[in-house]
Amino acid sequence: AGLSIEDTPRLKLKWAFISLLVVIIIVGNVFIPCDFNFWRKGRIPGEKLLYYREDVAATVVVREYPQGGQLNRVMEVDGTDVAGTDYMLRSTQKFQGHLPLLIHKDPKKVLIVGFGSGGTTWAVSQHNVKRIDVVELVPSVVEAAAKYFTGVNYGVMDDRRVNIKIGDGRNFVLTTQEKYDVILTESIHPIYAGNGNLYSREYFKLCKEKLAEKGIMSVWIPLWALPEQYFKMIIETFRQVFPYSTLWYVPNCLNRQVYLIGSKNELKIDFKSLQTQMSMKKIGKDLEEIGMNNSF
């Protein structure tokens, strides 16, 4: 029997499907790595898993990967990058440590909520402070930082002024009897589960109560993966608690970010004085590495 006219469209569809399948196989052979350990080792060729630990609070991972002719490291907490050695992550870690202390001018006691790689704590330690309290929820974060990120934190955990406490940051602020010149929150993205508490009115009010008379609070806000309405909500919530507040935009890397600085009393910012402090030897060198050593 011959081929009927009705069978022709079906035959064409069949050959089209076969052709598409052949193309998929060819592309797969070209672009998928031959080393199938790739899927176990990491997400890009050459990547290594350096650290993996499951805590009650979270799972912590440290990965090392090649980029731009060098090896970078990144720390993940429950699958989210929280700290690392690449330019963008170092920039965030350094600047969020320096900015509030430069604005305060003479801080002596600082509280940092979150430790990450320790880069922010190290930046704070470059200033003439007497005490740095750090609260980190996940014990393995501190362990991983001490082992794999000494090039970022420079062993700041051994600084006699640094006191690292394992626990919930909000609960620590609630129960502590200390008063701080500066309270700052590490780069904790507000969209991820559990992080919203550190951007709430209740948390801001708790921090305000634990500030010294001339104390200031600093809050990091990412501009990526954050819906505009959430961004506006955070700013408005912060301003309700801190009527004297300023917003600082950081344009030095692709991942845009801002910092909210709030105080109990009116805060007058002297940019000439700020520039003088930013030019100081240790601080100036650190800020120059991220292109942020000029206040103008």
PLM features: what roles do these ranges have?
Residues 3-104, 109-111, 160, 168-170, ...:
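Soluble small-group transferase modules, centered on the S-adenosyl donor enzyme superfamily
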Residues 1-3, 116-117:
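C-terminal structured "cap/appendage" subdomains that terminate the fold
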Residues 85-241, 247, 253-254:
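The AdoMet/dcAdoMet-binding core of the Class I SAM-like
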